[in-house]
Amino acid sequence: MKLKRKRVKPIALDDVTIIDDGRLRKAITAAALGNAMEWFDFGVYGFVAYALGQVFFPGADPGVQMIAALATFSVPFLIRPLGGVFFGALGDKYGRQKILAITIIIMSISTFCIGLIPSYERIGIWAPILLLLAKMAQGFSVGGEYTGASIFVAEYSPDRKRGFMGSWLDFGSIAGFVLGAGVVVLISTLIGEQAFLAWGWRLPFFLALPLGLIGLYLRHALEETPAFRQHVEKLEQNDRDGLKAGPGVSFREIATHHWKSLLVCIGLVIATNVTYYMLLTYMPSYLSHSLHYSENHGVLIIIAIMIGMLFVQPVMGLLSDRFGRKPFVVIGSVAMFFLAVPSFMLINSDIIGLIFLGLLMLAVILNAFTGVMASTLPALFPTHIRYSALASAFNISVLIAGLTPTVAAWLVESSQNLYMPAYYLMVIAVIGLLTGLFMKETANKPLKGATPAASDLSEAKEILQEHHDNIEHKIEDITQQIAELEAKRQLLVAQHPRIND
């Protein structure tokens, strides 16, 4: 049976997508703002955990109160995979823009509602139950938030600037933390700790609603990403009708054909988010509860660290466009393995300057991960399953990473060893290193299932020329390999004359 050879049309200049700079800026702003609001809540919750422990879990000793409050923080991560599957399938069916508008609505309302919950003294057991329900609603919406936002930015970004553009997404995360922590410190300082415990802790959560409305306005005004529009345009009419009728996503296909990418995604997210939650969510509680600093003192140190991270974040993304994503994952993992214990030795030194230095070491390591994560993850999967695959893998990983504050607090309480969080980070560093070694480089390459994307016509011509040069090099390599095989064949014939018989 003769196989029919399929002709592939060579790529032309018209096939390179020119990204409009104005739309790109709007896309990054809208995505980063929603992400900032997500982490604003995480920041506020981490920094007021001591207050929530007393409001919702009275009667327990301070250690149990802290673990209970942080456990309430961690439980919603059990819901995130469900949100990831739900919003991921819808995002591949209806597009990224619509889903991101929905997630920010749910997230802002549920965060706002936390500030409305009465204390345990007023409604008893219903207080922690309502808190848990609000956190679960957050977890469900966040299941589609970060992955959708990272895909949105990646599909809008030029290939050569995807690392830099993607880094602004986690810039928004850190900025959200800074805002949340700053608001907590400001309110606590202005009204005093007594009033803050009584009612002041509610005020930061009320800010979520206006922030959410701003984010909704920005996201609603955006167009769908170029990559998703290309995907829909390529579909035949029957396939397009099928797309509207139901999600065209096969999770069996994702698990069987993209399992390597799933493992890379899981490993990178675990390494990044465990470090994230350890530094930015657990550390304020560690400084106040384990090292006995005042709450405001510990928060101010973390705020200073995060402000420094804001300046480093886009630099990491910019450098990753030049040197690739793999080096940052590998170097960051090695650094974390060898510096985790020294950094905690500095943090436990009881000297402010050394404490700051220890936290700064962890922050730079975290920047190495966050600087490349938002640009690396979307590049692992093709357009038609990108949201579903990424949301599923990401939220399974976050399910593990989200337990970090609770696990770290429990390890310290049960062992009375202040270095247990450092040992935990060393284990995570091994996961990060294996991920970095086995992941494929994605920098300066088109997203799977999409045409090349450029900032302007000049860059498009350069990309096209590089593409043609690569084809010529591949042809030359194939020709050389054929010549080498022919030479080996001739040698075998000379050694074994009967081989031609």
UniProtKB/Swiss-Prot annotation:
Pfam families: Osmo_CC (PF08946), Sugar_tr (PF00083)
UniProt cross-references to InterPro entries, sorted A to Z: H+-coupled_symporters (IPR051084), MFS_dom (IPR020846), MFS_sugar_transport-like (IPR005828), MFS_trans_sf (IPR036259), MHS_symport (IPR004736), Osmo_CC (IPR015041), ProP_C (IPR036292), Sugar_transporter_CS (IPR005829)
GO biological process: amino acid transport
Membrane topology listed for this record: Multi-pass membrane protein
Cytoplasmic side: 1-38, 88-98, 144-170, 217-261, 320-326, 372-391, 439-501
Residues on Periplasmic side: 60-66, 120-122, 192-195, 283-298, 348-350, 413-417
Chief location of this protein within or outside the cell: membrane
Subcellular location: Cell inner membrane
Induction statement: Induced by osmotic strength and repressed by osmoprotectants. Expression is not affected by the growth phase.
Entry function: Involved in uptake and accumulation of various osmoprotectants. Allows the uptake of glycine betaine, proline, ectoine, and pipecolic acid. May be a contributory factor in the infection progression within the host.
Family: Belongs to the major facilitator superfamily. Sugar transporter (TC 2.A.1.1) family.
Protein name per Swiss-Prot or TrEMBL: Glycine betaine/proline/ectoine/pipecolic acid transporter OusA
Organism this protein belongs to: Dickeya dadantii (strain 3937) (Erwinia chrysanthemi (strain 3937))
Lineage: Bacteria, Pseudomonadati, Pseudomonadota, Gammaproteobacteria, Enterobacterales
Gene that encodes it: ousA
